[in-house]
Amino acid sequence: MNLLFLSTENPYPVDGGHHLRTFYVLKLLAKRYKIYFVGFAQDKEEFKYTPFIKPFCVSVDMFPVAKTGFNPGFLWLGGKNLFQKQPLIARRYFTPRACSRIEEILRDTDIDIVHVDMLALGMYARLFSDLPAILTNHNVESLRLFRWLKHEKNPLK
């Protein structure tokens, strides 16, 4: 069976919670499925880690996205996003090149199921609306924000 695996990051190196979870889910799924991995990288340095997930995948495609924080690329994206309906986090990962590659995989491969590793990748759902898909999330973001709000003293944050 063929599985399209969408991830906001390359899970390697396995050095934190997000990477741990994604890496081991990918590794476990690879025992049963042929994996077509599409991921994103904030930094050129991250591309050098693609060989570490290739043993689990038929194909690995990584696409650059704007790095989070105060840098020209992310600020430009944030400014443009003021005039968009979708949240910044979703727009950030929705790129024409990734869209084309996903369409190509879907056209050329008989994909049985799609694994969407984070809600931020939800804008791609229209490309595979006729396929079964699983959306996972790593955290309960509303709970994290609530806890942060209870402890933050600065009202401007």
Show which residues each predicted segment covers.
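N-terminal subdomain of nucleotide-sugar transferases
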Residues: 1-63, 109
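Acceptor-binding helix/loop patch of EC 2.4 sugar-transfer enzymes
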Residues: 8, 72-89, 134-157
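Short, solvent-exposed loop/turn segments at secondary-structure junctions
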Residues: 10-11, 42-44, 66-68, 119-122, ...
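Membrane-proximal helix-turn-helix segments that form the acceptor-binding/catalytic region
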Residues: 25, 100-104, 141, 156-157
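Short, conserved loop/helix-junction motifs that constitute active-site signature segments
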Residues: 29-30, 126-129
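A conserved catalytic-core segment of Leloir-type glycosyltransferases
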Residues: 40-104, 108
